[in-house]
Amino acid sequence: MKYDVIGDIHGCYDEMIALIEKLGYSLTSGVPVHPENRTLVFLGDLTDRGPKSLEVVEFVGRAVEDGAVRYVPGNHCNKLYRFFKGNPVKLQHGLETTAAEYRNLPKQKQKDIRDLFMRLYEKAPLYEILHNGELVVAHAGIKAEDIGKKPVGKVKQFVLYGDITGETLPDGRPVRRDWAAHYRGEPWVVYGHTPVKNPRMIHHTINIDTGCVFGNRLTAFRFPELTTESVPSSLPYDESRFRMEP
Protein backbone atom coordinates (compact mmCIF):
# COMPACT_ATOMS: atom_id res chain seq x y z
CA MET A 1 0.00 0.00 0.00
CA LYS A 2 1.13 3.53 -0.78
CA TYR A 3 0.09 6.48 1.38
CA ASP A 4 -0.46 10.22 1.10
CA VAL A 5 -0.36 11.88 4.53
CA ILE A 6 -2.03 15.30 4.70
CA GLY A 7 -0.95 17.80 7.34
CA ASP A 8 -2.92 20.13 9.61
CA ILE A 9 -6.00 21.35 7.69
CA HIS A 10 -7.54 23.64 10.33
CA GLY A 11 -10.77 24.24 8.45
CA CYS A 12 -9.17 24.92 5.06
CA TYR A 13 -11.66 22.75 3.19
CA ASP A 14 -11.10 24.19 -0.30
CA GLU A 15 -7.34 23.70 -0.09
CA MET A 16 -7.85 20.14 1.19
CA ILE A 17 -9.99 19.26 -1.83
CA ALA A 18 -7.50 20.93 -4.19
CA LEU A 19 -4.61 18.94 -2.68
CA ILE A 20 -6.51 15.64 -2.80
CA GLU A 21 -7.25 16.21 -6.49
CA LYS A 22 -3.65 17.23 -7.17
CA LEU A 23 -2.55 13.93 -5.62
CA GLY A 24 -4.60 12.13 -8.26
CA TYR A 25 -7.68 11.08 -6.29
CA SER A 26 -11.15 11.02 -7.81
CA LEU A 27 -14.02 12.39 -5.71
CA THR A 28 -16.88 11.43 -8.02
CA SER A 29 -18.14 8.81 -5.55
CA GLY A 30 -18.02 11.30 -2.67
CA VAL A 31 -14.95 9.70 -1.11
CA PRO A 32 -11.35 9.84 -2.40
CA VAL A 33 -10.37 6.94 -4.67
CA HIS A 34 -6.94 6.66 -6.30
CA PRO A 35 -6.35 4.73 -9.56
CA GLU A 36 -3.11 3.32 -8.11
CA ASN A 37 -4.77 2.14 -4.88
CA ARG A 38 -3.16 4.79 -2.69
CA THR A 39 -4.65 5.71 0.69
CA LEU A 40 -5.04 9.14 2.28
CA VAL A 41 -4.05 9.58 5.92
CA PHE A 42 -5.11 12.70 7.84
CA LEU A 43 -2.69 13.91 10.48
CA GLY A 44 -5.16 15.56 12.84
CA ASP A 45 -6.17 19.15 13.58
CA LEU A 46 -8.97 19.10 11.05
CA THR A 47 -10.67 22.14 12.55
CA ASP A 48 -10.27 25.60 14.13
CA ARG A 49 -9.23 28.99 12.76
CA GLY A 50 -10.13 28.23 9.13
CA PRO A 51 -13.44 29.05 7.42
CA LYS A 52 -14.95 25.58 6.85
CA SER A 53 -14.06 23.37 9.81
CA LEU A 54 -17.31 21.43 9.88
CA GLU A 55 -17.14 20.69 6.15
CA VAL A 56 -13.73 19.13 6.78
CA VAL A 57 -15.22 17.08 9.64
CA GLU A 58 -18.03 15.84 7.39
CA PHE A 59 -15.68 14.91 4.57
CA VAL A 60 -13.10 13.10 6.69
CA GLY A 61 -15.66 11.49 9.00
CA ARG A 62 -17.66 10.00 6.15
CA ALA A 63 -14.55 8.88 4.27
CA VAL A 64 -13.20 7.12 7.37
CA GLU A 65 -16.54 5.39 7.96
CA ASP A 66 -16.51 4.30 4.32
CA GLY A 67 -13.07 2.77 4.85
CA ALA A 68 -11.53 5.02 2.20
CA VAL A 69 -9.06 6.98 4.38
CA ARG A 70 -7.24 6.87 7.72
CA TYR A 71 -7.10 9.49 10.46
CA VAL A 72 -5.22 10.21 13.66
CA PRO A 73 -6.34 13.08 15.92
CA GLY A 74 -4.45 16.18 16.94
CA ASN A 75 -4.67 18.40 19.99
CA HIS A 76 -7.37 20.55 18.38
CA CYS A 77 -9.39 17.40 17.68
CA ASN A 78 -9.01 16.42 21.33
CA LYS A 79 -10.30 19.81 22.45
CA LEU A 80 -13.25 19.74 20.04
CA TYR A 81 -14.15 16.29 21.34
CA ARG A 82 -14.19 17.61 24.90
CA PHE A 83 -16.32 20.55 23.75
CA PHE A 84 -18.85 18.21 22.14
CA LYS A 85 -18.92 16.10 25.31
CA GLY A 86 -19.94 19.19 27.25
CA ASN A 87 -16.72 19.45 29.21
CA PRO A 88 -15.56 22.93 30.28
CA VAL A 89 -13.12 24.15 27.62
CA LYS A 90 -12.01 27.66 26.74
CA LEU A 91 -13.23 28.91 23.38
CA GLN A 92 -9.86 30.19 22.21
CA HIS A 93 -6.90 29.27 19.97
CA GLY A 94 -9.33 28.69 17.10
CA LEU A 95 -12.02 26.62 18.80
CA GLU A 96 -14.19 29.73 18.92
CA THR A 97 -14.45 29.70 15.11
CA THR A 98 -15.55 26.06 14.99
CA ALA A 99 -18.00 26.63 17.84
CA ALA A 100 -19.49 29.59 15.96
CA GLU A 101 -19.95 27.45 12.83
CA TYR A 102 -21.58 24.76 14.93
CA ARG A 103 -23.98 27.11 16.70
CA ASN A 104 -25.15 28.55 13.39
CA LEU A 105 -26.41 25.12 12.26
CA PRO A 106 -29.97 23.84 12.69
CA LYS A 107 -30.39 21.59 15.73
CA GLN A 108 -30.57 18.34 13.75
CA LYS A 109 -27.48 19.24 11.74
CA GLN A 110 -25.67 20.05 15.00
CA LYS A 111 -26.51 16.58 16.31
CA ASP A 112 -25.40 14.89 13.08
CA ILE A 113 -22.05 16.71 13.06
CA ARG A 114 -21.44 16.16 16.76
CA ASP A 115 -22.24 12.45 16.53
CA LEU A 116 -20.09 12.00 13.41
CA PHE A 117 -17.08 13.70 14.96
CA MET A 118 -17.41 11.86 18.26
CA ARG A 119 -17.50 8.52 16.42
CA LEU A 120 -14.49 9.58 14.36
CA TYR A 121 -12.46 10.59 17.42
CA GLU A 122 -13.43 7.66 19.63
CA LYS A 123 -12.52 5.06 17.00
CA ALA A 124 -9.27 6.71 15.90
CA PRO A 125 -5.85 5.48 17.03
CA LEU A 126 -3.74 8.23 18.59
CA TYR A 127 -0.97 7.20 16.22
CA GLU A 128 -0.72 4.73 13.34
CA ILE A 129 1.99 2.26 12.36
CA LEU A 130 1.72 1.50 8.64
CA HIS A 131 3.56 -0.21 5.77
CA ASN A 132 4.90 -3.12 7.86
CA GLY A 133 6.26 -0.77 10.49
CA GLU A 134 8.14 1.48 8.08
CA LEU A 135 5.79 4.47 8.48
CA VAL A 136 4.45 6.06 11.67
CA VAL A 137 1.86 8.84 11.61
CA ALA A 138 1.53 10.90 14.81
CA HIS A 139 0.16 14.43 15.01
CA ALA A 140 3.02 15.98 17.01
CA GLY A 141 5.55 13.16 16.57
CA ILE A 142 6.73 10.26 18.69
CA LYS A 143 10.03 9.08 20.15
CA ALA A 144 11.60 5.97 18.62
CA GLU A 145 11.45 4.09 21.92
CA ASP A 146 7.71 4.79 22.23
CA ILE A 147 6.69 3.37 18.85
CA GLY A 148 4.47 0.38 19.55
CA LYS A 149 3.61 1.46 23.09
CA LYS A 150 0.05 2.18 24.19
CA PRO A 151 -0.72 5.89 23.74
CA VAL A 152 -1.36 6.68 27.39
CA GLY A 153 0.28 9.04 29.87
CA LYS A 154 3.41 10.70 28.53
CA VAL A 155 3.13 8.95 25.15
CA LYS A 156 -0.38 10.35 24.64
CA GLN A 157 0.78 13.81 25.69
CA PHE A 158 3.71 13.63 23.27
CA VAL A 159 1.74 12.54 20.19
CA LEU A 160 -0.85 15.28 20.77
CA TYR A 161 1.30 18.18 22.00
CA GLY A 162 4.93 17.35 21.19
CA ASP A 163 7.92 17.29 23.53
CA ILE A 164 6.77 20.15 25.75
CA THR A 165 8.93 21.52 28.56
CA GLY A 166 6.17 22.99 30.71
CA GLU A 167 7.36 26.52 29.92
CA THR A 168 5.56 29.00 27.67
CA LEU A 169 6.59 31.66 25.19
CA PRO A 170 5.49 35.29 25.68
CA ASP A 171 2.54 34.70 23.32
CA GLY A 172 1.35 31.76 25.41
CA ARG A 173 2.50 28.97 23.11
CA PRO A 174 4.36 26.10 24.81
CA VAL A 175 8.12 25.69 24.57
CA ARG A 176 8.92 22.40 22.83
CA ARG A 177 12.15 20.44 22.57
CA ASP A 178 13.43 19.54 19.11
CA TRP A 179 12.79 15.80 19.42
CA ALA A 180 13.21 15.23 15.66
CA ALA A 181 16.85 16.39 15.78
CA HIS A 182 17.57 13.52 18.17
CA TYR A 183 15.43 10.84 16.49
CA ARG A 184 17.43 7.81 15.38
CA GLY A 185 14.68 5.30 14.63
CA GLU A 186 14.32 3.36 11.39
CA PRO A 187 10.59 4.02 10.76
CA TRP A 188 9.67 7.28 9.08
CA VAL A 189 7.68 9.51 11.44
CA VAL A 190 5.31 11.95 9.74
CA TYR A 191 4.00 14.72 11.97
CA GLY A 192 2.77 18.32 12.03
CA HIS A 193 1.54 20.50 14.90
CA THR A 194 4.24 23.19 14.65
CA PRO A 195 3.87 25.40 11.54
CA VAL A 196 6.96 25.58 9.32
CA LYS A 197 7.33 27.46 6.04
CA ASN A 198 8.66 24.40 4.23
CA PRO A 199 8.46 20.68 5.08
CA ARG A 200 11.28 19.83 7.46
CA MET A 201 12.88 16.43 6.80
CA ILE A 202 15.52 15.20 9.27
CA HIS A 203 16.56 11.75 10.57
CA HIS A 204 13.61 9.81 9.09
CA THR A 205 11.11 12.42 10.30
CA ILE A 206 9.18 15.04 8.37
CA ASN A 207 7.04 17.92 9.63
CA ILE A 208 4.37 18.67 7.02
CA ASP A 209 2.40 21.37 8.86
CA THR A 210 3.17 24.18 6.43
CA GLY A 211 0.64 26.55 7.97
CA CYS A 212 -2.19 26.59 5.45
CA VAL A 213 -4.49 28.37 7.88
CA PHE A 214 -1.81 31.05 8.33
CA GLY A 215 -1.60 31.79 4.61
CA ASN A 216 1.22 29.49 3.48
CA ARG A 217 0.50 26.03 2.01
CA LEU A 218 -1.24 22.71 2.66
CA THR A 219 1.18 19.82 2.24
CA ALA A 220 1.05 16.04 1.78
CA PHE A 221 3.88 13.51 2.23
CA ARG A 222 3.92 10.62 -0.25
CA PHE A 223 5.17 7.26 1.01
CA PRO A 224 7.19 5.26 0.04
CA GLU A 225 8.32 7.85 -2.52
CA LEU A 226 9.41 10.26 0.26
CA THR A 227 8.21 13.26 -1.74
CA THR A 228 5.82 16.11 -0.96
CA GLU A 229 3.02 17.89 -2.81
CA SER A 230 1.34 21.10 -1.75
CA VAL A 231 -1.21 23.72 -2.73
CA PRO A 232 -1.20 27.42 -1.80
CA SER A 233 -3.47 28.83 0.87
CA SER A 234 -6.22 31.30 0.02
CA LEU A 235 -5.90 32.99 3.42
CA PRO A 236 -3.79 36.04 4.42
CA TYR A 237 -0.17 35.26 5.25
CA ASP A 238 0.82 35.68 8.91
CA GLU A 239 4.61 35.67 9.29
CA SER A 240 4.39 35.67 13.10
CA ARG A 241 2.93 32.16 13.13
CA PHE A 242 6.03 30.54 11.70
CA ARG A 243 9.06 29.76 13.77
CA MET A 244 12.07 27.53 13.69
CA GLU A 245 11.70 24.02 15.08
CA PRO A 246 10.86 22.68 17.57
UniProtKB/Swiss-Prot annotation:
GO cellular component: cytoplasm
Protein family per UniProt: Belongs to the PrpE family.
NCBIfam families with a match to the protein in the record: PRK13625.1 (NF010148)
Protein task: Asymmetrically hydrolyzes Ap4p to yield AMP and ATP.
InterPro entries the UniProt entry points to: Ap4A_hydrolase, Bis(5'-nucleosyl)-tetraP_PrpE, Calcineurin-like_PHP_ApaH, Metallo-depent_PP-like, MPP_PrpE-like, Ser/Thr-sp_prot-phosphatase
Lineage, top ranks: Bacteria, Bacillati, Bacillota, Bacilli, Bacillales
Keywords: GTP-binding, Hydrolase, Nickel, Nucleotide-binding
EC numbers for this chain: 3.6.1.17
Pfam families, A to Z: Metallophos
GO terms assigned for molecular function: bis(5'-nucleosyl)-tetraphosphatase (asymmetrical) activity; GTP binding; nickel cation binding; phosphatase activity
Reaction(s) catalysed by this chain's protein: P(1),P(4)-bis(5'-guanosyl) tetraphosphate + H2O = GMP + GTP + 2 H(+)
Stored PANTHER family: BIS(5'-NUCLEOSYL)-TETRAPHOSPHATASE PRPE [ASYMMETRICAL], METALLOPHOSPHOESTERASE
Cited CDD domains: MPP_Prp_like (cd07423)
Protein name according to UniProt: Bis(5'-nucleosyl)-tetraphosphatase PrpE [asymmetrical]
Named cofactor requirement(s): Ni(2+)
Broad enzyme group: hydrolase
